[in-house]
Amino acid sequence: MMPTLAPPSVLSAPQRRCQILLTLFQPGLTATTATFSELNGVDDDIASLDISETGQEILRYHQLTLTAGYDGSYRVEGTVLNQRLCLFHWLRRGFRLCPSFITSHFTPALKSELKRRGIARNFYDDTNLQA
């Protein structure tokens, strides 16, 4: 009897890591290995490997650490400046590697958080941003 193999993810490793990091920066979202596994269409082992590689990359380039909480959720820790620089860097990568993720997941979450906080709509309204 042949073991059942999961089909490979349609996303490359850099795309998966980009989506992992941008998910960690989404406001109000608790991200676990299961979250990343479902998001990227991979099993938990590959998701764990991607999380580890993402953590190594942000440590090397941005002096940030990726820590796991007691409930299995992950978060990015470091100075506010390093976190912002990291976010901008990965947003640029995201626009190149996985633009559909940014438009369908990241942007709506960010807009709803800005609305919830009472930020003036003209800062995030699509009509004004197109001008």
Each model region followed by its residue ranges:
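Inter-domain helical "communication" segments and dimerization helices
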Residues: 1-131
